[in-house]
Amino acid sequence: MKLQEIKNIDITGKKVFIRCDFNVPMDEYNNITDDRRIRSALNTIRYCIDHDCSVILSSHFGRPKGGFEEKYSLLPIAKRLHILLKQDIKMAPGVICDETLQMAKELKAGEILLLENMRFEAGETKNDEELSKKLASMAEIYINDAFGVSHRAHASVEGISKYFDIEHKAAGFLMAKEIKFFHHIIHNPKRPFIAIVGGSKVSGKLEALYNLIPKVDKIIIGGGMAFTFLKARGHEIGNSLVEDDLIPEALKIMEEAKSKGVKLYLPVDVVAAEAFDAEAIAKIATIQEMPKGWMGLDIGPASALLFSEALSDANTILWNGPMGVYEMDRFAKGSTKISHAVANSYATTVVGGGDTADLVRVTGDEDDMTFISTGGGASLELIEGKVLPGVKALVIEEND
C-alpha cells in the first residue's frame, strides 16, 4: 500500500484544506486539559504556511445534537492554535455559510482560517454529497491529518476526497506517521511480539483479537473483558461484567491461540468490590475465591506481576485498553503497574486507544512510550486489518 504524502505533492502558494482531529478533552469551563492532538497537527500546518499556502482547518468536537451549540464551538481551539503557532487564527462563523465561504475565498498566503465544528452540519456524519462538494470548493488541495476519525466515512474525511485527484490530495505528516507505524508493527514486528488487550467489553475487541492471534507470540487479556474468558474457563466470577453470548467466541479465541502456539494470559487474581463504586468495600481475591455477588474492578497484584514477567522478553508491545476501572483511584493500581512495566521495557511500545493514552499520561509514562496513537477506534480497525475509508482515498493505485 503506497500512501500519497503531503511532502510528495506540490502545494506551494495553494489554498489547502486540512482535516485535523482537534477533539480534545475540556473541563466544564471550556479549558483544554490535554492539547496533544492539537500539537500533533502543528507539523503539517507549519509546513503549509512555510510553502506560502493559505490554510483552511477543519475538525469535529464532541457530539453536538445538530446545529450550533456554544459548548461545542471550536473557539477555544482557535485560541490554543494562536498561542502554539504565534499567529492570528481567523475564526469562521460556521462551516459552509456564505460568510465562511467568502472568508475562505479571500484568504491570503500565510493566513489560517478555522471552520466551526464540522458536526454542526448534519451532513457531516451522513457523508452528504452536497456538503462534501461545498467543502471541496474552498480549496485546491485536500490534506487528511485526522487519523483518529479516518475509520469514519464522513463528509470532511471521505466525501470531500472524491473531488480531488491523487496529485491534489494527500496524508499529512501525523496521518502518514500513524499509518506507517501500525502497518510496520502489524506486518513486520520485531519478536517476541506481545499484545495487551484490555477495556470493558470483548464485543468491541473481537475482530482485533482474531487478527492479532496469528501475528503475536503472547497475548495478555485484562480489564472487564477478561471475565468473559474466565467464565468460559469455568470460573465463578460473581457479579463481574460478562458477555454471556460471547463465551463461545472466547473459547474459540483461546483454542485458536493454543493451536497457533500463542501464550494467552488471563488474570489470576482481582480487586473485587461489593458494588461499582469508588467507596465500596473492596479486597483482593484469587480467581478461584471470588466472593459471591461481588465484582472484579481491577487486576490484582499477582496478575500485575505475572503480566509484567510475561512482558520481560518482549521486543514489540502493542497495548490497547486498561486493566481495570482506572478512573477510580482504588481500581487503578493494576493499570498503573502495567503502564510502568511497558514504559520500562526495552521493547518498541505502541499505545493505541483514547483510554490507554489518557492512562499513560496520568501515570507519567507518556514520554517513555515509543509511540502513542491519537486514534482509538481507528487504531483498533487497523489492528483488525481493515482499510480505513479516510486512508483508502489517499492510496496511490499501483499498476500491476
Swiss-Prot record:
ATP binds at residues 205, 296, 327, 353-356. This is Phosphoglycerate kinase. HAMAP family: Phosphoglyc_kinase (MF_00145). GO terms for cellular component: cytosol. It comes from the Bacteria. Keywords: ATP-binding, Cytoplasm, Glycolysis, Kinase, Nucleotide-binding, Transferase. The lineage of its organism: Bacteria, Pseudomonadati, Campylobacterota, Epsilonproteobacteria, Campylobacterales. Monomer. GO terms for biological process: gluconeogenesis; glycolytic process. PANTHER family: PHOSPHOGLYCERATE KINASE (PTHR11406), PHOSPHOGLYCERATE KINASE 1, CHLOROPLASTIC-RELATED (PTHR11406:SF23). The gene is pgk. Pathway: Carbohydrate degradation; glycolysis; pyruvate from D-glyceraldehyde 3-phosphate: step 2/5. Its EC number is 2.7.2.3. It is found in: Cytoplasm. InterPro entries: Phosphoglycerate_kinase, Phosphoglycerate_kinase_CS, Phosphoglycerate_kinase_N, Phosphoglycerate_kinase_sf. Substrate binds at residues 21-23, 37, 60-63, 119, 152. Belongs to the phosphoglycerate kinase family. Gene3D superfamilies: Phosphoglycerate kinase, N-terminal domain (3.40.50.1260). Its main location: cytoplasm. It catalyses: (2R)-3-phosphoglycerate + ATP = (2R)-3-phospho-glyceroyl phosphate + ADP. PROSITE patterns: PGLYCERATE_KINASE (PS00111). GO terms for molecular function: ADP binding; ATP binding; phosphoglycerate kinase activity.
